[in-house]
A protein has these predicted regions:
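A substrate-binding/cap region within the structured catalytic cores of diverse enzymes
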Residues: 1-102
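Structural recognition of the beta-strand scaffold that forms the well-ordered cores
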Residues: 18-22, 111-114, 138-143
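Generic local-structure boundary detector
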Residues: 28-33, 39, 62, 67, ...
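Membrane-water interface signatures at transmembrane helix termini and the short loops
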Residues: 84-87, 95-102, 108-128
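C-terminal regions of proteins
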Residues: 103, 119-200
């Protein structure tokens, strides 16, 4: 939040721009990742409002991409992989419904949604879930690409399968602004908190 979202939230606050938290509750997503679809039945009606009405609605081609990603980062048993995927699509479907509801409430507004790259890369994830809700929506994906030197697009070694509408080139943060020990500590605290959290 501090590095990626806070500057924009502060900008929005100071310019009176409305902001919505589009994602699903982290606690609910975590427990879906542990228990699967059955966890939904344990939620109170107020808790169910914190996730999509159809949290497990399938997103074409996304499962293959997600499983390929998991294979690269860690080996999980099949059941755990499936539950991780269910948690992931709960996030994407919830963000899509939140965006769509914001558009229904304010159709004259442009909506800017921020998310991690995986959620919108190649128009999958949240983008595909939003298109399912309304195929006529005009959705554009803007993807940041970190580069050492600004080059022409042809000289960049971009993934040829990347199918996003726009990319913008950003230089990495200066070394003095990147505190690796702080990042490690923050991630460790996040994972410890996650492990300690209990599900119903």
């Amino acid at each position: 939040y501090v590095a990626s979202y806070r500057p924009l939230v502060e900008f929005a606050k100071s310019h009176f721009v409305p902001v919505i938290a589009a994602n699903a509750s982290a606690d609910i997503v975590r427990c879906i990742g542990r228990q699967g679809t059955a966890y939904i039945d344990k939620l109170y009606s107020t808790e169910k409002q914190q996730i999509a009405k159809q949290p497990f609605a399938e997103i074409p081609d996304y499962k293959v991409k997600f499983y390929n990603f998991l294979e690269k980062v860690r080996q999980l048993p099949e059941k755990r992989k499936e539950r991780s995927y269910l948690a992931q699509i709960t996030r994407d479907n919830t963000m899509a419904e939140s965006i769509y509801q914001a558009w229904l409430d304010h159709p004259e507004h442009k909506i800017v949604h921020l998310n991690g790259t995986f959620h919108s890369e190649n128009h999958l994830g949240t983008v595909a879930a939003l298109k399912r809700l309304n195929p006529k929506l005009n959705i554009q994906v803007v993807t940041p690409v970190q580069v050492e030197q600004f080059e022409t697009i042809e000289k960049l070694n971009l993934d040829p399968n990347l199918n996003n509408d726009f990319i913008y080139l950003v230089k990495p943060q200066p070394e003095q602004y990147v505190d690796a020990s702080y990042k490690r500590k923050a991630r460790q605290q996040m994972f410890e908190k996650s492990e300690q959290a209990t599900c119903k």
